[in-house]
């Protein structure tokens, strides 16, 4: 009887031992884009974008997960998440169209509004010095614009892009911002839509500061927040709960605040600091 109990006890201990050693950590597959200056995947500035900094923080603070980083286009990211592939992304806008298939974190990073970027020689066509009525620009048959397929610019801008997506003067391709910027410099498009620090980054990269102009978009909010998002699955929900705990503990810390300021000019950094607490819910 004693021997039988001993055998059972040993069996239980062995089973628990094998269960412990055989349990694999859950895995987060991070979908990242070559999207400077938010995410910079190569070159001298590699890893210095705001999304890069956030991803580094999350990987460091979530050691109980295995982490894979997978470069892909905006369009592929959107398609794979819609198909149910378990992916997460460190920077994305929360939109009604995405809610059925994505789990979103609390606001994670703050950004200034998008701008219309155009060739300087076309300046009179873009509200010379004032805010641009984007819908009027999209309606102008003699102005050709370029937008990235699968990229969300902001809810109000996305709605206009969808409305005019069938127009021949709006080119939509699954390209990087850099490619559209080169098209702009070559005169193949008249305007593109970028964030201000994104436009400045590319203008510096191509030594084109004098060749492009930037205007705000009428009616656009002055700032907008991105979130971290995962595929809407049980795993995605668990990951987002853990990410929210990390973000909630970091939002008010100076080092975390500076992630949102990366690559902005000093005057724009002041604007981000002005909007940060209210937009990000810091108390």
Predicted regions and their residues:
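Short loop->beta-strand "edge-of-pocket" segments that line small-molecule binding or catalytic clefts
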Residues: 26-41, 48, 130-153
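Periplasmic-binding protein-like
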Residues: 33-36, 111-115, 207-244, 267-282
């Amino acid at each position: 009887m004693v021997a039988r109990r001993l055998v059972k006890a040993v069996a239980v201990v062995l089973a628990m031992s094998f269960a412990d050693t055989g349990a694999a950590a859950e895995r987060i597959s991070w979908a990242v884009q070559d999207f400077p200056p938010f995410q910079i995947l190569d070159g001298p500035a590699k890893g210095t974008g705001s999304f890069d900094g956030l991803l580094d923080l999350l990987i460091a603070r979530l050691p109980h997960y295995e982490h894979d980083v997978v470069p892909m286009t905006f369009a592929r990211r959107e398609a794979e998440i819609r198909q149910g592939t378990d992916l997460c992304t460190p920077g994305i806008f929360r939109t009604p169209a995405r809610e059925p298939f994505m789990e979103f974190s609390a606001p994670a990073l703050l950004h200034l509004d998008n701008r219309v970027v155009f060739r300087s020689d076309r300046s009179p066509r873009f509200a010379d010095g004032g805010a641009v009525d984007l819908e009027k620009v999209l309606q102008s048959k003699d102005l050709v614009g370029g937008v990235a397929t699968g990229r969300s610019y902001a809810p109000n801008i996305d709605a206009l892009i969808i409305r005019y997506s069938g127009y021949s003067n709006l080119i939509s391709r699954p390209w990087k911002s850099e490619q559209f910027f080169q098209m702009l410099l070559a005169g193949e498009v008249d305007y593109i839509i970028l964030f201000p620090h994104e436009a400045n980054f590319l203008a510096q990269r191509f030594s084109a500061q004098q060749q492009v102009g930037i205007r705000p978009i009428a009616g656009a909010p002055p700032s907008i927040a991105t979130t971290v998002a995962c595929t809407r699955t049980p795993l995605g929900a668990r990951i987002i709960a853990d990410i929210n705990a990390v973000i909630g503990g970091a939002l008010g810390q100076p080092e975390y605040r500076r992630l949102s300021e990366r690559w902005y000019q000093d005057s724009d950094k002041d604007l981000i600091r002005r909007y940060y607490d209210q937009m990000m819910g810091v108390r």
